[in-house]
């Protein structure tokens, strides 16, 4: 993919732009991201402590994870191509007094050309299933992290169980997400993501599943990667 061609689906941008003002409403369509945030934040910080690190959050949206990582002591840059979401993230950081955080409207591929090997940690959470070319995003993340640095991904598996739970259940039965949030064909199997990571010269060190309890509204790590899963990678030392 050329650097002049944005790896973005206009329909996806429009979808999130329409909801931008609700990013920080804990009872909105983004409630699942707020509920999942403590789990993914703890997982990231446990493997690659955030204190004093330079971190990039790819597809940051309204800044839910980026803000939390900054509060853990990281210097955070959040990037996204949804202008309205970025404005919400910037306003929240200003109102909350979040330290050491900035937001930019730039593609991950363009930033990789501009600032390769610039970050200790790169996160790309719940984003790959929304772009036309996820492998391009993985390649760019690998270029942006320093040798020895960590890259974290999370996405949704592609199988019948994931379709029933993450799409039919979450969007149509429970109403946890707006209908049409996810497209089955864009979901990514762990083996496919691992292949993309290895092609980008990232070592896959850990893959964990995430399970949701609708009664307690809490997520927990598990060994079951059949629906939501996380993948931790490292770039080899130079």
Curated annotation (Swiss-Prot):
Protein keywords: Methyltransferase, S-adenosyl-L-methionine, Transferase, Ubiquinone biosynthesis
Enzyme class: transferase
Keyword Ubl conjugation included in the entry's annotation: no
Its EC number(s): 2.1.1.222, 2.1.1.64
Positions annotated to bind S-adenosyl-L-methionine: 40, 59, 80, 125
SUPFAM superfamilies linked: S-adenosyl-L-methionine-dependent methyltransferases
Pathway in which this enzyme or protein is active: Cofactor biosynthesis; ubiquinone biosynthesis
Transmembrane segments annotated in the record for this chain: none
Gene Ontology annotations of biological process type: methylation
GO molecular function, one term: polyprenyldihydroxybenzoate methyltransferase activity
Stored CDD domains: AdoMet_MTases
InterPro entries for the chain: SAM-dependent_MTases_sf, UbiG_MeTrfase
Reactions the enzyme catalyzes: a 3-demethylubiquinol + S-adenosyl-L-methionine = a ubiquinol + S-adenosyl-L-homocysteine + H(+); a 3-(all-trans-polyprenyl)benzene-1,2-diol + S-adenosyl-L-methionine = a 2-methoxy-6-(all-trans-polyprenyl)phenol + S-adenosyl-L-homocysteine + H(+)
Function, as annotated: O-methyltransferase that catalyzes the 2 O-methylation steps in the ubiquinone biosynthetic pathway.
Similarity annotation: Belongs to the methyltransferase superfamily. UbiG/COQ3 family.
UniProt protein name: Ubiquinone biosynthesis O-methyltransferase
Organism: Paracidovorax citrulli (strain AAC00-1)
């Amino acid at each position: 993919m050329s650097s002049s061609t944005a790896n973005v689906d206009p329909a996806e941008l429009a979808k999130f732009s329409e909801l931008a003002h609700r990013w920080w409403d804990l009872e909105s369509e983004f409630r699942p991201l707020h509920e999942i945030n403590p789990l993914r934040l703890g997982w990231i910080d446990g493997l690659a402590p955030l204190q004093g690190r330079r971190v990039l959050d790819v597809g940051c949206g309204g800044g839910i994870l980026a803000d939390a990582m900054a509060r853990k002591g990281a210097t955070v840059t959040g990037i996204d191509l949804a202008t309205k979401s970025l404005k919400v993230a910037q306003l929240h950081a200003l109102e909350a007094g979040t330290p050491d955080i900035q937001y930019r409207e730039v593609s991950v591929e363009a930033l990789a050309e501009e600032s390769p090997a610039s970050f200790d940690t790169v996160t790309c959470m719940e984003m790959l299933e929304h772009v036309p070319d996820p492998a391009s995003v993985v390649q760019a993340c690998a270029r942006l992290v320093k040798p020895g640095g960590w890259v974290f991904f999370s996405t949704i598996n592609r199988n019948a169980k994931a379709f029933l739970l993450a799409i039919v259940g979450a969007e149509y039965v429970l109403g946890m997400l707006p209908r049409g949030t996810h497209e089955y064909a864009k979901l990514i199997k762990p083996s496919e993501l691992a292949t993309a990571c290895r092609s980008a010269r990232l070592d896959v060190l850990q893959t964990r599943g995430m399970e949701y309890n609708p009664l307690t509204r809490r997520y927990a790590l598990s060994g079951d990667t059949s629906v939501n899963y996380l993948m931790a990678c490292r770039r080899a030392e130079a």
